[in-house]
Amino acid sequence: MTLDLDALDRALDALPNLFRGPGGVAGVVKDGQVVASRAWGYADLTRRRPMETATRLPICSISKQFTCGVLLDTLGDTAAYDARVAEFLPQFEGPLPTLRQLCDNQSGLRDYWALTVLQGAEATQTFRREDALPLIARMKTGHFPPGTAYSYCNCNFRIVSEILESETGRALPDLYAERIFGPAGMRTAELTSDTRHPADEVVGYEGSDAVGFFPADNGIFWIGDAGISASLQDMLAYESWIDATRDDENSIYRRISVPPAYVCGTPASYGFGLSHETVAGVKVTGHGGALRGFRAQRFHAADERLSVMVIFNHEASAHAAASSLLAAALGHEAPKGARPEGWAGQWLDPESGLLLRVGEDAEGLTLRFATGPDRLTLGEDGVPRGAGVSLARDGAMLVMNRTSDNLTVRAEPLPVVTVADAGEIAGRYHARELEADLVIEARDGGAYAGFEGLLGEGPMERLHPVGPDVWIVTTRRSMDAPAPGDWTLQVRREGGAVTGLRLGCWLARRIDYARV
């Protein structure tokens, strides 16, 4: 396969303008050799410190594959340690996930960073290492049986890291360095778990080109699920190492990139900290990463021996940027879809309790269900398709097939409500699942929700009606990124009287609150 280097150069030149922000880095590896390496903008605007290819940046959740790689390289068969999962979930009432299901995001556990919102956290407060396990230990149920579906869950990898350190008797930073950083030639990569002290004093920025950029104030401690800082030089060395070991079936990357599957045998889209998807017409493994003020994305196309890496110190889409580089290098043009008609609307999934909203534009559809929006284009057969998702209609119902999640949803139409009296739902509610409270206040047409729990009393969040007895709670900033976004809140009644609520987002579904 021959790269279109001219097109790749043009795509690289376009990144600072297309994905506007303080700075970024991007690089490409082909056949084990670095063919492009760029750094632009500033690692700190105020101090005028330029971004460089040697500047270490948080790679965030890309760290998950390193955790899984070390796990396989040190402990081997994960099944031998399945019994240890119970130690971290002492109140869990259903079947427990296996260690492999944790690594594959098939545990069914709710994401602990999403739950920090419901436990009363404020986005910038300190979250210590010792704060995580008590929060996880409160879990009593999951949102699906282990091994049957996919849901992104950071605490899966926190549990994995705790087991890994306990079984080896060694600290995770040392294991990363011995098993991956050293062999791969990642000379400056290290685990920087405390986000208050970023490597090389790099500054991440919230905001946008429309409103301006301001330094992100992060205070979380993460390990196993994220936490590695690495320069572009380090990450390109990692990609070269992957290529150099491609023919060794016992190499770490070969082992973590085996095709995953669900317990029913259906192929899965995520395994051992790697996403399996098709980008620019080719199969890739990779992962994204996010922390407030930072975004990262890597892709590796094994058959093409091609890798792409992008990191921003702002919140533009690194996934879109990396995809554009892959498409340029391969000469891939995405097919244009027909203009959709009659798809716009909103529906409610009775199983998950989540809202589905579909918007139309000239180029396709925007589906809002998971943490981020899905873009779908209309094929010649009239079926809207996106990455791992398609839509169909069955009368008034909307059928969403998320092959990437092993999930089919038959959602019922939800009439639009834009004005509702929140007075009857105002009050205090308690969630047994979380051992935490929700307070709703209503005044002069406005409604707000506040969460109280293990981590304190969080800020009041906006509450907006969207349908009969259905509201959304809007969370735009949280400890981790991206934030949960819109939570769907359903009102539960008995004899017309409000008795409770059901709250959920894609990361944390079906949480019941009883009126106090």
Curated annotation (Swiss-Prot):
Transmembrane segment boundaries: none
Stretches the record annotates as Important for specificity: 476-486
Activity regulation note: Inhibited by beta-lactam compounds such as 6-aminopenicillic acid, 7-aminocephalosporanic acid, benzylpenicillin and ampicillin. Inhibited by p-chloromercuribenzoate.
Keywords: Aminopeptidase, Hydrolase, Protease
GO BP annotations, alphabetical order: proteolysis
Family: Belongs to the peptidase S12 family.
Protein name listed in UniProt: D-aminopeptidase
Name of the gene this protein is made from: dap
